[in-house]
């Protein structure tokens, strides 16, 4: 049976949620600047939430020419600590370590992956290791961790790849319904930093529009914060 203290805590939490929702109008369209301001004022959680974007695209990813995928280097970073694994031959291990890789090895890392030990957020590989990595493709692929030359994670330039991963590189990929979702920084970032990240990301997705696509490409866009409110963006305000 709940005591008075428990009830007070629950009521307090409910009140914060109601107050937060009142600050964001569900029937209103916002430009990016106003959206960021609203989400900050409506945040009530005790941790530092992530600013998240959802973009609905007028594509059908089932068609190979409409698969939208790429990477964006966010100017202000993501605010997250990224653990990077590098799979390379022995002669390049020290180079990878010096560049800041958290895990470095060849078959040793592949064996750990097979055993279910995946303690990294990004996996970078040199081209000469891709044949061996193929044995764990079914494990890494569904997790979005499979090295890919189009994303810059299969490369001879280990140093630059590690730098990009650590400094705030974000991958985007359209899901089956044409939805792209990504985290673009912490809500504690300055408005300017968040807007820079947003503009960089949105511009990259818009540039990725398939050449032969008919009809509207950008259908809808929403911003939200972790466990917070969601606001819809006025697409006419996007340059």
Curated annotation (Swiss-Prot):
CDD domains: Ribosomal_L1
Regions annotated as coiled coil: none
HAMAP family: Ribosomal_uL1_B
Name the UniProt record assigns to this protein: Large ribosomal subunit protein uL1
Stated role: Binds directly to 23S rRNA. The L1 stalk is quite mobile in the ribosome, and is involved in E site tRNA release.
Molecular-function GO terms, alphabetical: rRNA binding; structural constituent of ribosome; tRNA binding
Assembly with partners or alone: Part of the 50S ribosomal subunit.
Source species, domain of life: Bacteria
Entry similarity comment: Belongs to the universal ribosomal protein uL1 family.
């Amino acid at each position: 049976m709940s005591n008075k203290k428990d009830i007070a805590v629950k009521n307090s939490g409910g009140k914060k949620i109601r107050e937060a929702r009142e600050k964001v109008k569900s029937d209103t369209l916002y430009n990016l600047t106003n959206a960021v301001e609203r989400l900050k004022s409506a945040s009530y959680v005790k941790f530092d939430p992530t600013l998240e974007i959802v973009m609905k695209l007028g594509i059908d990813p089932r068609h190979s020419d409409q698969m939208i995928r790429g990477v964006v280097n966010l100017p202000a970073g993501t605010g997250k600590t990224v653990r990077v694994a590098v799979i390379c031959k022995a002669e390049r291990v020290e180079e990878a370590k010096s560049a800041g890789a958290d895990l470095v090895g060849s078959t040793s890392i592949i064996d750990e992956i097979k055993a279910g030990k995946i303690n990294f957020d990004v996996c970078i590989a040199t081209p000469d290791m891709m044949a061996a990595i193929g044995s764990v493709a079914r494990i890494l692929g569904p997790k979005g961790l499979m090295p890919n030359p189009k994303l810059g994670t299969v490369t001879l330039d280990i140093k630059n790849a590690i730098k990009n991963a650590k400094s705030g590189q974000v991958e985007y990929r359209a899901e089956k319904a044409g939805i792209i979702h990504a985290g673009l920084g912490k809500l504690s970032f300055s408005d300017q930093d968040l807007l820079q990240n947003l503009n960089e990301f949105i511009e990259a997705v818009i540039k990725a529009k398939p050449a032969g696509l008919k009809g509207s490409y950008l259908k809808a866009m929403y911003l939200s914060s972790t466990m917070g409110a969601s606001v819809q963006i006025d697409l006419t305000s996007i340059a």
